[in-house]
């Protein structure tokens, strides 16, 4: 009897170990000897016309190698800086695997409460999950110009390229839905890292995979990530929603890749582990343009 209980205990331990992923970060996500790292600039933006009354915190990472004179590529993050991106980007710039790039991260907007200023109203799902050009307008017309109005501690100007081929956007969960919505609706970003994208019934982003099926392909390169333990709520199944998007991308002939990780949870460390490879994929062949997709199927109307 004791032997059977021991075997049952060991089996349970093995199952639990298999269910918990331990993500090992590569050297690309760690500080390296001989690589110069840049600085963060923190600011608050509260002058939005696109989203009136909102305030948000902005975090800009400027690599040490940036000269303050040449327009730099830009990567825009939702929900603040993540993925150990500052370290990864400086490492990959140093190894000449990606171009000079400035990182711009902003928190979702908050609106100060009329009756209780200490309890602001969160604007996140309204801004991120709504499939419209509005957040893209905010990024292009307000956020990026605001970033360019700032300077580094050494007095260097921040000059961001206006070429869509030099722009990337990323996020996790609703931030990933936002990244897709911005790239799709503005056509001013050509590289997207989407992790655990909320392509579900929060505010309509579940329609995005259908749009990919129906519309002419756009010159955007995508990297998708999700996991078998991603969210599953009354708004939908994140795992299957991301699979549907990948199927749509394949149908339409996009240049994309994906990583669906067994047992990965919603926005866990898997998204950080994959970020260096995502950057390599999204920026491969630069300064060449992201290729225009070749539709695999002809639709007769």
Cite the ranges covered by each PLM segment.
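Sec-dependent signal peptide recognition
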Residues: 2-9
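Glutamine-centric residue-chemistry signal
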Residues: 3, 18-20
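Hydrophobic h-region of N-terminal signal peptides that target proteins for export
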Residues: 10-18
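Non-catalytic cap/lid and distal C-terminal segments of serine-dependent acyl enzymes
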Residues: 20-301
């Amino acid at each position: 009897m004791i032997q059977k209980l021991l075997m049952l205990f060991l089996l349970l331990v093995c199952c639990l170990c298999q269910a918990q992923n331990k993500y090992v970060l590569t050297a690309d996500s760690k500080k390296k000897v001989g690589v110069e790292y840049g600085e963060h600039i923190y600011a608050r933006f509260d002058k939005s016309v696109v989203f009136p009354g909102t305030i948000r915190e902005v975090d800009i990472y400027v690599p040490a190698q940036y000269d303050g004179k040449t327009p730099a590529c830009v990567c825009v993050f939702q929900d603040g800086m993540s993925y150990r991106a500052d370290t990864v980007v400086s490492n990959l710039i140093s190894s000449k695997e990606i171009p000079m790039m400035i990182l711009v991260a902003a928190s979702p907007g908050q609106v100060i409460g009329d009756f209780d200023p200490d309890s602001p109203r969160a604007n996140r799902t309204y801004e991120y999950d709504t499939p419209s050009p509005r957040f893209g307008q905010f990024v292009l017309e307000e956020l990026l110009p605001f970033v360019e109005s700032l300077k580094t501690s050494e007095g260097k100007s921040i000059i961001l390229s206006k070429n869509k081929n030099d722009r990337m956007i990323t996020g996790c969960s609703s931030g990933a839905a936002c990244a897709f919505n911005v790239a799709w609706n503005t056509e001013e970003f050509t590289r997207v890292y989407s992790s655990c994208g909320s392509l579900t019934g929060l505010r309509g982003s579940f329609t995005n995979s259908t749009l990919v099926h129906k519309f002419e392909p756009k010159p955007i390169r995508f990297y998708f990530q999700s996991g078998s333990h991603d969210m599953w709520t009354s708004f939908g199944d994140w795992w299957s929603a991301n699979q549907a998007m990948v199927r749509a991308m394949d149908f339409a002939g996009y240049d994309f890749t994906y990583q669906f990780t067994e047992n990965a949870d919603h926005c866990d460390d898997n998204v950080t582990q994959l970020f260096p490879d995502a950057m390599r994929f999204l920026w491969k062949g630069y300064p060449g343009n992201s290729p225009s997709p070749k539709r695999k199927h002809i639709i007769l109307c």
